[in-house]
UniProtKB/Swiss-Prot annotation:
Keywords: Membrane, Transmembrane, Transmembrane helix
Name of the protein this chain belongs to: Hydrophobic protein RCI2B
Cellular location(s): Membrane
Classification of source organism: Eukaryota, Viridiplantae, Streptophyta, Embryophyta, Tracheophyta
Domain of life: Eukaryota
Keyword match Transmembrane: yes
Transmembrane intervals: 2-22, 32-52
Membrane topology of this protein: Multi-pass membrane protein
Organism: Arabidopsis thaliana (Mouse-ear cress)
Cellular component terms per the entry's GO annotation: membrane
Length: 54
């Protein structure tokens, strides 16, 4: 695991859409993460961690 991935994981725990945005930009992954975070913080975190480590 690189340092960049580690930083993205930390950001995904603090603010899930930010971690996904840094990795993928403003693509569909970001919007899915944003919607999941708005529906509930935990689903947003789980999705962000999954998509970053995939």
């Amino acid at each position: 695991m690189s340092t960049a991935t580690f930083v993205e994981i930390i950001l995904a725990i603090i603010l899930p859409p930010l971690g996904v945005f840094l990795k993928f930009g403003c693509k569909v992954e970001f919007w899915i993460c944003l919607i999941l975070t708005l529906f509930g913080y935990l689903p947003g975190i789980l999705y962000a961690l999954y998509i970053i480590t995939k």
